[in-house]
Each structure stands twice: as structure tokens, then as C-alpha cells.
């Protein structure tokens, strides 16, 4: 949800657009299928983190757009804070493991 909220913080998007933007910005690392995306969007909408509206495009297609709400912005700040804490802890452990491995390797040379 942090990734979806981050994308919607920049601009309103429709479902397919979210999947394509996520794929593009992550350099093909994150690829959400419709069966995964739409339940996430519905969950965020039920939590009032996002809202949706219909828009008729010039080509006649009607698309459902999603936008982040003020509550969603607060949730995103909280999620970013949690991610920073988590990633710092992982980096600390990885750094520690790398240092120990390098030290052990030097001892056996």
C-alpha cells in the first residue's frame, strides 16, 4: 500500500496506469496483476486512505480514477517512517554480517 499511496500522492491515476507506473518506476521489479491491485485499492478505499471518481476520456472510455485523501497522506507519512526504521535495521544487520564475514575471511587467509 505504501507504493500505491506514494504514486497517488503525485497525481490521480486509474488502475492500469498505477500498474504501469509502478512497473516503470521500479524498473520492472514490481509488477502488480489486476487480481492483486484491485483488492488493495478497495481496501485503501474502505480505510478512507483513497477515494475514487469516474472520468470520461476524450476517446469515450470511462475510467475510474483514484486519489489520495488527507487521511491517506497521514497514513503514507506513517508508512514511510515505519519503512525507514525497518530498512535501517536491515541495513545495520547486513552491514554487521558483511563486516563479520570479511573479518573471518581475512583471518583464514
Model-identified regions with their sequence ranges:
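N-terminal helix-turn-helix DNA-binding core of bacterial DNA-binding proteins
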Residues: 1-36
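Amphipathic alpha-helical recognition patches that constitute DNA-binding helices
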Residues: 3, 36, 67, 71, ...
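Amphipathic alpha-helical dimerization/coiled-coil segments
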Residues: 74-109
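Short, well-ordered turn and helix-capping elements at secondary-structure junctions
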Residues: 22, 26, 54-56, 70-72
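Basic, amphipathic "hinge/linker" alpha-helix immediately C-terminal to the N-terminal HTH DNA-binding motif
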Residues: 61-80
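Basic amphipathic alpha-helical segments that dock to polyanions
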Residues: 37-44
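Beta-hairpin "wing" of winged helix-turn-helix
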Residues: 45-62, 67
Amino acid at each position: 500500500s505504501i507504493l500505491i499511496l506514494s504514486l497517488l500522492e503525485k497525481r490521480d491515476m486509474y488502475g492500469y496506469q498505477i500498474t504501469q507506473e509502478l512497473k516503470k518506476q521500479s524498473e520492472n521489479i514490481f509488477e502488480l496483476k489486476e487480481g492483486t491491485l484491485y483488492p488493495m485499492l478497495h481496501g485503501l478505499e474502505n480505510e478512507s486512505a483513497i477515494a475514487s471518481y469516474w472520468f470520461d476520456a476524450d476517446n469515450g472510455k470511462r475510467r475510474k480514477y483514484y486519489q489520495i485523501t488527507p487521511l491517506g497522506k497521514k497514513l503514507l507519512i506513517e508508512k514511510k517512517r515505519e519503512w525507514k526504521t525497518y530498512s535501517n535495521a536491515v541495513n545495520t544487520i547486513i552491514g554487521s554480517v558483511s563486516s563479520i564475514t570479511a573479518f573471518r575471511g581475512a583471518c583464514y587467509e
